[in-house]
Amino acid sequence: MQPLANRFILGSLLLVGVEFAIAQTTAPAAAGSGIKGKEIYDARCSACHSVDDNRVGPLHLGVLGRKAGGVKSYSYSEALSKSKVIWSRETLTAWLSNPEALIPGQRMGYAMDNAQDREDVVAYLATLKAIK
């Protein structure tokens, strides 16, 4: 009876180990850092975007809570202008991951591969509150 109990225990431990390994590889990124996000934004986003001014892409001041395509002074693609997306942490993260999947027909030709970088940039964007 003892060998059967040992096999059961070993099998259970193996299963727990496999589940732990899977959880580690599919775990979501940690909460974003606005400080790190600003560094990433300055390095990767500022060629096309600015906090205060439109460039190749629209300004980002007050982006959280704004309708996609909602900066009146910027000329958006038809797809983005007609979109019903409201920028939230979730939609911004999805956008940075794959803009075309979120809003087909948009014009942004950049995606951020690293999940933690996306979380950090979104944390930074969340700090850019428009003055009302």
Where are the regions a protein language model picked out?
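Short secondary-structure junction motifs
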Residues: 45, 55-57, 103-105
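N-terminal signal peptide c-region/cleavage motif recognized by signal peptidases
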Residues: 17-18, 26
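The canonical Cys-X-X-Cys-His
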Residues: 41-51, 121
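Gly/Gly-Pro-rich "capping" loops immediately C-terminal to redox-active cysteine motifs
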Residues: 34-38, 50, 54-89
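Processing junctions and N-termini across compartments
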Residues: 17, 39-42
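Electrostatic cytochrome c docking/interface patches
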Residues: 23-40, 132
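Bacterial N-terminal signal peptides that target proteins for export
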Residues: 1-12
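C-terminal capping alpha-helices of c-type cytochrome domains
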Residues: 88-132
